[in-house]
Amino acid sequence: MNREEALHVLEHSEEIVSAQEVSASIEAMAKAIGAQVSEDFPLVLSVMGGAAVFTGMLLPHLDFPLEFDYIHLTRYRNTTKGGDKMEWRVAPAEAVKDRVVLVLDDILDEGETMAAIRDRIMAMGATKFLSAVLCEKTIEKSKPLRPDFCGFEVPDRYVFGCGMDAKGYWRNLPTIRALTDGA
């Protein structure tokens, strides 16, 4: 992992969503979320580390009382392909019991990670589970769940920026980019 490799990744990518489109989509998503859960005093859980940027952009637009925490479940480990093994680094707190829980994540690829989160949270006694993702990847196979709120559908390519990384790089970009050949 080095600066040259990071620049190589960026050079072999293309912008698919602009920073302005990201901002507008997040504002619209916040309104939709508020319409559904503003009276529920939801527990909002951010999935680290990918959802950090998305969460930071979304939370200021949620203009209702909520409680916030984070969880960390990973499958990727700085690669561009998800692994079969999921690793809980920070599990949900007991505060999910008898709560409406909204989970924020950067992207829903195959849906396996979000399904595992949903199953764990519901088993812990949440009354309702909702998910919001910045992106959902369009893929051929069926998914165990779809997000309740989604900013963008993206093609079945490796995407990064706005919290999503490419080989550990570029979570900090304000745009969403897709790798091209040669990355």
Question: Residue spans of the language-model regions?
Answer:
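PRPP-associated nucleotide enzymes
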Residues: M1-A183
